[in-house]
Amino acid sequence: MAKEVAGQIKLQIKGGAANPSPPVGPALGSKGINIMEFCKQFNAKTQDKAGKILPVVITYYADKSFDFVVKTPPVAIQLLEATKKKSGSAQPNRAKIAEITWDQVKAIAEDKLVDLNCFTVESAMRMVAGTARSMGITVKGTFPGNN
């Protein structure tokens, strides 16, 4: 028989660096989840992505057990890594901070496709390009899908 789901918690944690301090401890402790057990499992699962911010969805059950799913890093974080910047533009319509190519956009879109609400790489590329524009990052050239 399936366990009864009590709820879900969504967090963004650096890979391989989960510890009981905030924000992880209070979020899990208030639901009665074993914090140290989650930290050990999360750190073991994300050793290869150490230092990257990773969204995680924790599903906890009535018997205080839990499961979690680690997703790919947010598009904004991947764009900042691609441009080697620390943050986006405060005025994205006026002050552009960097440029990226459609090849870089495609690489990010292919990586993120499993987590996005779309089915094709082209639509994922449009989503990534929109995020880039809202951060003050210019995408060089024309969209490769336009012939």
Swiss-Prot record:
It comes from the Bacteria. Gene3D superfamilies: Ribosomal protein L11, C-terminal domain, Ribosomal protein L11/L12, N-terminal domain. One or more lysine residues are methylated. The keyword Ribonucleoprotein applies. One of its GO terms (molecular function) is structural constituent of ribosome. GO terms for biological process: translation. It holds the Pfam family Ribosomal_L11_N. GO terms for cellular component: cytosolic large ribosomal subunit. Keywords: Methylation, Ribonucleoprotein, Ribosomal protein, RNA-binding, rRNA-binding. Signal peptide: none annotated. HAMAP family: Ribosomal_uL11 (MF_00736). Part of the ribosomal stalk of the 50S ribosomal subunit. Interacts with L10 and the large rRNA to form the base of the stalk. L10 forms an elongated spine to which L12 dimers bind in a sequential fashion forming a multimeric L10(L12)X complex. Forms part of the ribosomal stalk which helps the ribosome interact with GTP-bound translation factors. Belongs to the universal ribosomal protein uL11 family. This is Large ribosomal subunit protein uL11. It comes from Parabacteroides distasonis (strain ATCC 8503 / DSM 20701 / CIP 104284 / JCM 5825 / NCTC 11152). The gene is rplK.
